[in-house]
């Protein structure tokens, strides 16, 4: 099984404010869809509730929750460890949030697929965990200039050393 983390991260590692993204970048959403379609996505309860249309289409959706169990279109497990037991050896799984799940998955992930945004949002209340600790090396980096209402950003793929 391949475990991947995917996130859009501002310069100060901000990823959210009031259960929404801090920057809405259309190309980032296209990349997210392209990378995750046909695979398993694993998320926490709050991340599921932040999705405008519920479960993501054309993906196996797994929600981690110890309290709620009603997540239409999703498999529900109480922990990441339990969820991983139900994913096949040849499958790709993408951790899509929230922050506590990102923290836990950083220790076991094979790849990070980050959109690194070269700006700091005016408000943020959720931050991606520190990841520049020497564990990861850059596999590829695709820079995008600021345009329209979007700040400059880069699609950066990291692989575990």
Task: Place the predicted regions along the sequence by residue.
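Flexible, gly/pro- and Lys/Arg-enriched active-site loops
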Residues: 4-40, 45-161
């Amino acid at each position: 099984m391949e475990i991947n983390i995917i996130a859009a991260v501002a310069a100060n590692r901000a990823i959210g404010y009031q259960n929404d993204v801090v920057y809405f970048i259309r190309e980032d959403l296209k990349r997210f869809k392209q990378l995750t379609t046909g695979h398993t996505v694993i998320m926490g309860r709050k991340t599921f509730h932040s999705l405008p249309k519920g479960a993501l289409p054309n993906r196996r959706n797994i929600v981690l929750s110890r309290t709620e169990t009603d997540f239409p279109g999703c498999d529900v497990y109480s922990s990441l460890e339990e969820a991983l037991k139900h994913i096949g050896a040849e499958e790709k799984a993408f951790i899509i949030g929230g922050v506590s799940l990102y923290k836990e998955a950083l220790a076991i992930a094979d790849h990070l697929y980050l959109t690194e945004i070269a700006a700091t949002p005016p408000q943020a209340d959720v931050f991606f965990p520190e990841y520049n600790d020497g564990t990861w090396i850059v596999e590829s980096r695709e820079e995008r200039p600021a345009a329209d209402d979007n700040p400059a950003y880069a699609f950066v793929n990291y692989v575990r050393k």
